[in-house]
Regions:
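Conserved beta-strand signature within the Rossmann-like core of class I S-adenosyl-L-methionine
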Residues: 146-153
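A short SAM/SAH-binding and catalytic strip from SAM-dependent methyltransferases
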Residues: 118-130
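C-terminal alpha-helical "lid/dimerization" subdomain adjacent to the S-adenosyl-L-methionine
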Residues: 7, 78, 155-210, 214, ...
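Conserved class I S-adenosyl-L-methionine
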Residues: 1-44, 60-64, 85, 188-193
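A short acidic, Gly/Pro-enriched loop at the edge of an enzyme's catalytic core
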Residues: 107-118
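A short glycine-rich, Lys/Arg-flanked "PGG" loop and its adjoining helix->strand segment in the class I
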Residues: 132-144
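Class I SAM-dependent methyltransferase SAM/SAH-binding core
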Residues: 50-108
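Core SAM-dependent methyltransferase catalytic element
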Residues: 214-238
Length: 238
């Protein structure tokens, strides 16, 4: 793994790596796996395709892809401890010949231009300073005609759903994570404001414009759980 200078996101996720998959399920009302599966189901992969999974974390998306397609997957993440947990999961499924995990940042991908047939990223843009530049970098390593896909948290627009979302993120999640661990309580306090701020700065139409400006017109946007999560996917111009 290539060492990188520790960032806020790396420090945040290092603190929850051992129990990430379990509590990611609990805190999303057991939607975490369903969202991931829907994301992967939108991929139009062909035999032998090379996929880049950015913010791979514990390699959940990478393993989901490997379970449905015979291509090779490179997972990249800033957190070494998340990657170590992911590597154990990869080896447990005997997929280390097809899934490679490396440490790095989405803003400076260590790959040549037009390397990958598909690039997918999850919960990424809230942690980068310049979403536009990050999408440009992701597009750089994507082959013309290749797919870019993303999964991110959202803020529901329906008033009563938004009210429940606010109660959960402002009160319930910070309190329920206290007995779990210091790392998870930190996440419980951080996540709601982080999502709210990002959705104000980069609503879906703004994200679509960023994709378009970087040669990837989104062909679809799908809200999940009344807008608590959003999947986007599009194809890079040839």
């Amino acid at each position: 793994m290539v060492p990188v200078k520790k960032t806020f996101a790396q420090d945040l996720f290092d603190g929850i790596a051992p129990s990430y998959d379990t509590w990611a399920q609990v805190l999303t009302f057991f939607q975490y796996l369903r969202w991931r599966r829907f994301l992967v189901s939108q991929m139009a992969l062909r035999p032998g395709n090379l996929v880049l999974d950015v913010c791979t974390g514990t390699a959940g998306v990478a393993l989901e892809i490997a379970g449905h397609h015979d291509g090779r997957i490179v997972g990249l993440d800033a957190s070494q401890l998340m990657l170590e947990a992911g590597l154990r999961a990869v080896e447990k499924k005997d997929l280390d010949g097809r899934v490679q995990l490396i440490q790095g940042r989405a803003e400076r991908l260590p790959f040549p231009d037009e390397t990958f047939d598909t690039v997918v990223f999850t919960y990424l843009l809230r942690y980068v300073r310049d979403p536009d530049a990050t999408i440009r970098e992701l597009s750089r390593v994507l082959k013309p005609g290749g797919e870019l896909l993303s999964l991110e948290f959202g803020v529901p627009e329906t008033l009563w759903v938004r009210a429940l979302w606010e109660i959960y993120n402002r009160i319930v999640m910070p309190v329920m994570t206290i007995p779990v661990s210091r790392g998870w309580h930190r996440v419980g306090c951080f996540l709601g404001p982080s999502i709210r701020d990002f959705c104000q700065r980069c609503p879906v139409d703004r994200l679509a414009a960023i994709w378009l400006d970087n040669g990837i017109p989104p062909v679809a946007t799908r809200p999940l759980l009344k807008g608590a999560a959003i999947v986007m996917w599009g194809t890079k111009r040839r």
